[in-house]
Amino acid sequence: MKPHFRNTVEPMDPRTFVSNFNNRPILSGLNTVWLCCEVKTKDPSGPPLDAKIFQGKVYSKAKYHPEMRFLRWFHKWRQLHHDQEYKVTWYVSWSPCTRCANSVATFLAKDPKVTLTIFVARLYYFWKPDYQQALRILCQKRGGPHATMKIMNYNEFQDCWNKFVDGRGKPFKPRNNLPKHYTLLQATLGELLRHLMDPGTFTSNFNNKPWVSGQHETYLCYKVERLHNDTWVPLNQHRGFLRNQAPNIHGFPKGRHAELCFLDLIPFWKLDGQQYRVTCFTSWSPCFSCAQEMAKFISNNEHVSLCIFAARIYDDQGRYQEGLRALHRDGAKIAMMNYSEFEYCWDTFVDRQGRPFQPWDGLDEHSQALSGRLRAILQNQEN
């Protein structure tokens, strides 16, 4: 039997949406969780079969949370539509709590014909280890069915507004900080789920051939260490990668460089007054403006040391040399990536699936030449 679409959604009030789907990372007083869901067949051209809105209170019993309400509703719905594979999409104001995440993971394991994509406006108790583990199990890619979880960007907020809000023809108006908050939450989710980079993305963007062209993206991998008894101890909860935000993508009209996205993220970690070492591995060295902002950061945070390893030197025919010298003068360690740094990034940040790092032709020669060029740039500050 071919199911038919049933429009059972009572649209959400615009003020309710704007208030509850605020993507400010840290919010208090919003105790209601909203879940907007859409069910389709896996045929991408097919129309929605059903749509619902669920709500619940974060501090109520788990059975009253919207995720559990969805599971009960979908169990009944599935009995009438058991002969096909379905794609379920959620837009939620808070990501699932531990118990709900575990229940959803169990549901997906029992019904492999259902795929679930979860777009979240905010992360709920993301700093708690049990919560982190529950989300990793829910989104685990290997070993069985899993959910795909993403942070809502401008497009998802707009889609949710168009599908579930009584906007009366008015377009979605994003908050001013939506892009910045998106970047923070996306990086945090990447840390939490331990996202890894596609091998092709790494080899394409971190190739240190001097004649590379057409690479307009900057990737930045990072790790954080804390000094304890004269030993640098890795803080694996603050390890990941991000890239620049291109213009007009995710609500950034002018775009935002990867280094600035990274600087936005650091205060979110709430590092205390102990000594920390932050190491960045970048596909391009910082431009003048980013170098200035990074220099300002280390000047204002003397307990944090910064090391930057770049695959290539970004030469915009502008003041990039001046920026690198200022960054170096203010205490940052700047060097070109060599074989050991490329291998470390491959082993740490790439979904290599057991494959060892394979250097490209000329890697060592290019690294030596770039190191000499960088050395000349930095030494010029003393001339």
Swiss-Prot record:
EC number(s)?
A: 3.5.4.38
Post-translational modification remark:
(Microbial infection) Following infection by simian immunodeficiency virus (SIV), ubiquitinated by a cullin-5-RING E3 ubiquitin-protein ligase complex (ECS complex) hijacked by theSIV Vif protein, leading to its degradation.
Query: CMP/dCMP-type deaminase domain location, by residue?
Result: 29-138, 214-327
- Give the principal location in a single coarse category: cytoplasm
Highest taxon listed in the record's lineage: Eukaryota
Activity regulation statement: (Microbial infection) Antiviral activity is neutralized by the SIV (SIV-mac) virion infectivity factor (VIF), that prevents its incorporation into progeny virions by both inhibiting its translation and/or by inducing its ubiquitination and subsequent degradation by the 26S proteasome.
Q: Name one Pfam family in it.
A: NAD2
Query: Where's the (Microbial infection) Glycyl lysine isopeptide (Lys-Gly) (interchain with G-Cter in ubiquitin) crosslink?
Result: K270, K333
Identify which residues the record assigns to the active site: E259 (proton donor)
Check the record and name the Gene3D superfamilies matching this protein. Answer: Cytidine Deaminase, domain 2
Modification Phosphothreonine occurs at = T32, T218
* Annotated site residues (Interaction with DNA) in this chain: N244
According to its record, what are the GO cellular component terms?
cytoplasm; nucleus; P-body; ribonucleoprotein complex
This molecule's function is given as: DNA deaminase (cytidine deaminase) which acts as an inhibitor of retrovirus replication and retrotransposon mobility via deaminase-dependent and -independent mechanisms. Exhibits antiviral activity against vif-deficient: HIV-1 and simian immunodeficiency viruses (SIVs). After the penetration of retroviral nucleocapsids into target cells of infection and the initiation of reverse transcription, it can induce the conversion of cytosine to uracil in the minus-sense single-strand viral DNA, leading to G-to-A hypermutations in the subsequent plus-strand viral DNA.
**How does the entry describe the domains?**
The CMP/dCMP deaminase domain 1 mediates RNA binding, RNA-dependent oligomerization and virion incorporation whereas the CMP/dCMP deaminase domain 2 confers deoxycytidine deaminase activity and substrate sequence specificity.
Oligomeric and partner information: Homodimer. Homooligomer. Can bind RNA to form ribonucleoprotein complexes of high-molecular-mass (HMM) or low-molecular-mass (LMM). HMM is inactive and heterogeneous in protein composition because of binding nonselectively to cellular RNAs, which in turn are associated with variety of cellular proteins. The LMM form which is enzymatically active has few or no RNAs associated. Its ability to form homooligomer is distinct from its ability to assemble into HMM. Interacts with APOBEC3B, APOBEC3F, MOV10, AGO2, EIF4E, EIF4ENIF1, DCP2 and DDX6 in an RNA-dependent manner.
- Protein name listed in UniProt: DNA dC->dU-editing enzyme APOBEC-3G
Species in which this protein is naturally found: Macaca mulatta
